């Protein structure tokens, strides 16, 4: 009985032990699963962190790497007239440029400062003085860049340029030689990204071809023949309403043009080998101011003769830039000097009002005298700078790489943005108001378009910007649903630039003065401007030019020339 009792008790104990073991194993298994799940979850989080960290690292060190989270940067925006010609409803923070950058890089500009083009530089002076800089901004003065570097206000961009700029962007900068990037290096450090000032070529003479046809005039082959055409416009009162005096060749009182202005008389100065308002190499190899030379004196005498003949607008001294533009757009003027892009501004507006107006460009290279070597400077270039301490200085390089390389040469999804070229949307619509391109980009684009039109090149080989212009030019040639933008694209790219390509024009080699101290003091600038206008209008004899030169040196010019010669040695 005892044994039987023990056996029963043993069986119970055995069952209890088995059950306990089973429960223990079950508990251990559950614990192991929970531990594994926790470990897997931890590993997943760590993996996500590593992935996210890797994404940030890729974004910081590559041109096209996309940020895992939106990076917002504050910006000082230079806004253009008429909302930069942006399509209705688009803004400087929400347009095709900003949306594409958001999609491609996951970045967004926040325009904390906005100012018009004509007041932007003055505004920049204020915020720099007050040390109220946005993360990114464009400045338009080399002296301002010098000041910002001296006061340690901006970031060193050397490393981010190396890693976050594409090879093509670097090649674009290289097409200008080493001087351009060297101009923004301080103690070997790259402190800004300069605009590449593309060669816009010489000024062309734009004439109303429909007026010439109406008067039975032949197209001019020389500058003097062109002035005969303008004289005929005057005698036949072309563009003048009853009681109004006809308008001759309109020109701005500054007389000398820039890469962004029309209405100069540069070709007339070039006819005499003169380089007013430019520093040039003198006969003895020293730097001289071009406005003081005998060649400039001869050109002024010729301008006076044109004024006396009524060819030059008799009221040119009273007109402002806006007034000159109004004369062209209103159809009162039939002649002025302007660069190849003139159809975009102001001629496009006149064509929209009067589609029968027919402007043609003329170029007379045979009449350009061999001039002395002139010096270029970087004083008026635009520069992109980054605020000292901003954590994403690479963002500037990435924007340049996307806008001026990827979307123009590789992207298959940037059509809407690239239509901006044909729509003549102003560059101020871009977050960074500079352009980066090859030195001879203007001529390369036209040569490629002409090859496709002639059937010597496939359209697929065109870059995005070239394709946009080609399609507009093709629309104009075919005459189907032609828009004013199509007309402007054809007149600028084919008629104007095509004229330069045909004449085998080549970008002249530039010699740079490595100094930013070239600004003419206001007193000397005013003396020069008043003297030149008075001589042209006949209020002073041409002999007064020699007296002007003496006064220029006496009133501070002598010290200025000495200083510049010292800097250039």
Language model features with spans:
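Conserved N-terminal structural module of periplasmic/extracytoplasmic solute-binding proteins
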Residues: 3, 28-226, 287-289, 411, ...
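Sec-dependent N-terminal signal peptides of Gram-positive bacterial secreted proteins and lipoproteins
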Residues: 7-31
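Short, solvent-exposed loop/beta-turn-alpha elements that line the ligand-binding surface or hinge
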Residues: 65, 156-175, 218, 276-294, ...
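Long, His/Glu/Asp-enriched segments that create or flank divalent metal/ion-associated functional microenvironments
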Residues: 99-102, 339, 474, 480
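Helix-loop-helix "hinge/cap" segment bordering the ligand-binding cleft or interdomain interface
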Residues: 158, 185-260, 281-327, 332, ...
């Amino acid at each position: 009985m005892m044994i039987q009792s023990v056996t029963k008790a043993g069986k119970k104990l055995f069952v209890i032990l088995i059950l306990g073991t089973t429960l223990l194993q079950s508990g251990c298994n559950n614990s192991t699963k929970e531990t594994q799940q926790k470990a897997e979850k931890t590993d997943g989080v760590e993996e996500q962190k590593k992935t996210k960290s890797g994404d940030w690292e890729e974004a910081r060190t590559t041109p096209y790497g996309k940020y895992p989270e939106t990076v917002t940067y504050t910006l000082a925006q230079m806004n253009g007239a008429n909302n930069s010609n942006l399509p209705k409803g688009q803004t400087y923070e929400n347009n095709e440029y900003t949306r594409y950058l958001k999609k491609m890089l996951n970045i967004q500009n926040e325009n904390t400062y906005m100012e018009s083009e004509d007041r932007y530089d003055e505004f920049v002076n204020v915020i720099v003085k007050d040390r109220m800089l946005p993360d990114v901004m464009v400045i338009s003065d080399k002296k301002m860049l010098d000041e910002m570097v001296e006061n340690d206000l901006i970031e060193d961009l050397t490393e981010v340029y190396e890693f976050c700029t594409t090879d093509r962007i670097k090649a674009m900068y290289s097409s200008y030689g080493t001087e351009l990037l060297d101009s923004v290096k301080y103690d070997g450090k790259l402190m800004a990204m300069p605009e590449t000032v593309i060669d816009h070529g010489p000024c062309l003479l734009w004439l109303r071809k429909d007026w010439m046809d109406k008067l039975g005039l032949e197209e001019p082959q020389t500058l003097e023949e062109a002035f005969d055409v303008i004289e005929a416009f005057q005698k036949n009162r072309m563009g003048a309403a009853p009681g109004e005096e006809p308008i001759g060749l309109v020109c701005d009182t500054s007389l000398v043009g820039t890469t962004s202005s029309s209405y100069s008389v540069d070709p007339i100065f070039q006819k005499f080998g003169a380089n007013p308002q430019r520093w040039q190499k003198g006969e003895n190899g020293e730097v001289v101011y071009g406005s003081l030379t005998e060649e400039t004196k001869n050109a002024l005498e010729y301008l006076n003769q044109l004024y006396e003949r009524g060819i030059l607008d008799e009221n040119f001294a009273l007109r402002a830039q806006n007034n000159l533009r109004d004369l062209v757009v209103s159809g009162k003027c039939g002649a002025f000097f302007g660069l190849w892009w003139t159809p975009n501004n102001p001629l496009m507006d006149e064509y929209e009002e009067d589609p029968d107006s027919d402007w043609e460009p003329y170029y007379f290279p045979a009449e350009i005298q061999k001039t002395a070597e002139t010096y270029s400077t970087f004083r008026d270039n635009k520069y992109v700078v980054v605020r000292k301490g901003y954590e994403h200085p690479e963002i500037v390089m990435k924007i340049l790489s996307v806008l001026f390389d990827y979307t123009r040469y590789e992207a298959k999804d940037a059509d809407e943005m690239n239509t901006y070229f044909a729509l003549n949307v102003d560059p101020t619509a871009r977050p960074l108001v500079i352009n980066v391109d090859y030195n001879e980009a203007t001529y390369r684009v036209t040569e490629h378009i002409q090859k496709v039109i002639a059937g010597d090149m496939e359209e697929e080989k065109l870059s995005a910007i070239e394709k946009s212009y080609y399609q507009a030019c093709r629309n104009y040639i075919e005459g189907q649903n032609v828009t004013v933008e199509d007309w402007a694209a054809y007149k600028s790219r084919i008629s104007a630039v095509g004229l330069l390509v045909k004449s085998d024009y080549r970008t002249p080699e530039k010699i740079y003065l490595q100094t930013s101290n070239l600004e003419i003091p206001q007193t000397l600038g005013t003396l020069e401007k008043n003297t030149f206008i008075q001589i042209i209008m006949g209020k002073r004899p041409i002999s007064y030019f020699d007296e002007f030169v003496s006064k220029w040196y006496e009133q501070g010019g002598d010290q200025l020339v000495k200083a510049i010669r010292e800097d250039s040695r």
